[in-house]
Regions:
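Helical transmembrane-bundle signal
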Residues: 37-47, 51, 71-78, 101-105, ...
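Structural signature of hydrophobic alpha-helical transmembrane segments
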Residues: 57-73, 116-130, 180
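C-terminal ends of transmembrane helices
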Residues: 75-89, 136-146, 194-195
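Membrane-proximal helix-loop-helix units in multi-pass membrane proteins
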Residues: 101-160
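Loop-to-transmembrane alpha-helix initiation sites
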Residues: 171-183
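Short, highly charged, low-complexity non-transmembrane loops/tails of multi-pass membrane proteins
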Residues: 200-215
């Protein structure tokens, strides 16, 4: 992707299948995507801290539920504005997000326990709620593949390891806590670093999007 010229309102690039422009609207979409990731990372870190540091505090554990809801909404915003060449993959991640959100709502409404405790005590709930983290992991994979980000290279295998480890019980509580803490820390690092990445990189080659659209 090569910059050809910079008019006042848009930038013109040479893509694989022809020229394309990056407009202010494109840039705004990227900023929204990154802001969503930032809010999601912050909410995840807060939730992880409450679980790891205040597990004996009923109020703290109950507070995880609204924090998780904010995380889910922010992730949805990012999934709505992310640029992925494969439309089917993009839609699949959005469907995963929606399924996981519906499952989390069902568990939160049906369970007499706070959501965090219900998931911890009943690992089978992750068969539904886990779709949220599958969607998030799709973003990690995309960022690792496209931009060679070190933190997402650890997150891409680390997230399913923790989720599956809890579902099937092959991780100790100490290992789960360690992986959760690492996940929260790397997620924050990833989200912060995104704000310093050149915006056109997140937009990608729009000529490819246009080409695939007509296939």
């Amino acid at each position: 992707m090569q910059l050809l010229k910079s008019p006042d309102e848009s930038e013109v690039y040479q893509g694989q299948f022809g020229e394309f422009t990056i407009t202010q609207s494109d840039r705004t979409g990227v900023l929204i995507y990154r802001a969503g990731l930032g809010v999601a990372a912050l909410c995840f870190a807060i939730g992880a801290t409450l679980v790891l540091q205040q597990s004996d505090n009923p109020i703290a554990i109950q507070a995880v539920t609204p924090v998780f809801a904010c995380f889910w909404i922010a992730l949805g915003v990012s999934l709505a504005t992310i640029h992925i060449y494969m439309i089917a993959l993009h839609r699949a991640l959005q469907v995963f997000w929606a399924i996981g959100g519906a499952a989390a709502l069902f568990v939160a409404v049906q369970s007499s326990e706070p959501l965090a405790l219900a998931v911890y005590e009943h690992p089978a709930t992750l068969w539904g709620i886990g779709f949220i983290f599958a969607a998030l992991n799709g973003i990690y994979f995309k960022e690792a593949f496209c931009f060679n980000r070190l933190e997402t290279k650890f997150l891409t295998p680390g997230v399913p390891l923790l989720i599956l480890g809890h579902m099937f019980g092959f991780l100790s509580a100490e290992n789960e806590q360690f992986l959760l803490a690492i996940w929260a820390a790397l997620f924050i690092i990833f989200a912060v670093r995104k704000f310093f990445q050149p915006i056109p990189q997140d937009i990608g080659d729009k000529s490819v999007f246009e080409y695939l659209k007509h296939q």
